[in-house]
């Protein structure tokens, strides 16, 4: 003990699966072992046999180096953990932003779709209303046309009947006053006598007297019938 420094032979055994070394129950990585080898005094020697490493260092020095290397490894691990945590947070933020953008895009698309559907429904209702109004107007016009045709037919019938009745009345009226030549035979004889005796009309005086008597008799007969 005293001022002498005790030394012990420490064996570093390699782990085939995890590429680390066990030092008295402490698992060290190859990076730690390499740094320990590089920082060891020039008087220390390393030995290699069957994949194992040997090093002669003091117990205190070994503990110090192991503690330092473990602290470095821990700091490195914490730094890497912080980096991974930062990257994870950044990834989460990016994912959240992407999800928000996607949600907004879906919402905008949904709103646009709903607006388009609303416009389509409104247009359909307008077309239905216009079609209903047109059908109503068409039915009204057809009804009015039918009434006009009926009125025209009735007017034609009444007009025809009235015309026929008026024609019959006029015809009956004129038939009632229909006249025939009076004393037609004597009138013809007088005309013939006047043509034959142009310069001797007195020869026709006897026929003229008979014609006048015939006319007067006819007038008297008509007056008697009318009275």
Curated annotation (Swiss-Prot):
- Got any disulfides in this one, which pairs? 183-214, 193-204
UniProt KW keywords: Acetylation, Cytoplasm, Disulfide bond, Host-virus interaction, Lipoprotein, Membrane, Mitochondrion, Mitochondrion inner membrane, Myristate, Nucleus, Phosphoprotein, Repressor, Transcription, Transcription regulation
The tissues in which it is expressed are: Detected at low levels in brain, placenta, lung, liver, kidney and pancreas with increased levels in heart and skeletal muscle. Higher expression in primary lung cancers than in normal lung tissue.
Membrane topology (UniProt): Lipid-anchor
In this UniProt entry, the residues modified to Phosphotyrosine are: 49
GO CC terms in record: extracellular exosome; MIB complex; MICOS complex; mitochondrial crista junction; mitochondrial inner membrane; mitochondrion; nucleus; SAM complex
Residue interval(s) of motif Cx9C motif 1: 183-193
Q: Where in the cell is it found?
A: Mitochondrion inner membrane; Cytoplasm; Nucleus; Mitochondrion
Pfam annotation, one family: MIC19_MIC25
Intervals of motif Cx9C motif 2? 204-214
Complex and partners: Component of the mitochondrial contact site and cristae organizing system (MICOS) complex, composed of at least MICOS10/MIC10, CHCHD3/MIC19, CHCHD6/MIC25, APOOL/MIC27, IMMT/MIC60, APOO/MIC23/MIC26 and MICOS13/MIC13. This complex was also known under the names MINOS or MitOS complex. The MICOS complex associates with mitochondrial outer membrane proteins SAMM50, MTX1 and MTX2 (together described as components of the mitochondrial outer membrane sorting assembly machinery (SAM) complex) and DNAJC11, mitochondrial inner membrane protein TMEM11 and with HSPA9. (Microbial infection) Interacts with human cytomegalovirus protein UL13; this interaction alters cristae architecture.
Listed name of the protein: MICOS complex subunit MIC19
